[in-house]
Amino acid sequence: MTTAELTFRAATEADIPAVVELVESAYRGDASRAGWTTEADLLEGQRTDPEGVAAVVRHADGRLLLAEIAGETVACCQLEHRGDHVYFGMFAVRPKLQGGGFGKVVMAEAERTARAEWGAAEMRMTVIRQRADLIAWYERRGYRRTGRMTPFPYGDERFGIPQRADLEFELLVKTLD
């Protein structure tokens, strides 16, 4: 599989189970250790669930963007228009494809979509502050750290079961050309 084979489309309700499986495989449990984006050492439990994915699919001012190869979902990301910017989230690439340039291509398509669909001037995301490797990857793609932190939702198992007491999110931003 190569990045040249990727096609993109908006997710539908029928895609929800595949998206949940993809996101879980990229971030949680032993399957996630095949890639470099695992959060398995920071969080146990779920990363998302069908209800959470359905809310993204149904959001009137957003899109769950799927990247496919020959009809198989291999990556996804959430785009949510929020006034002057678009929020980027739920980013996942199949673990065995990570490191092969797929994430870079998906992110470029997400940024293109944010500009084309909503005229967004900025993309924003929140990343667990302790994920230095992931933050560095985003920085190489033009995102900058803001130093603005928000607390991790301890006690809400919809976001996972923390394995340490100091988790928090940092806001990253990028001006879209």
Region annotations inferred by a language model:
Residues V56, A121-A136, R140-D177:
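C-terminal "cap" of GNAT-fold acetyltransferases
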Residues M1-P17, E21, E170-D177:
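Conserved N-terminal entry element of GNAT/NAT acetyltransferase domains
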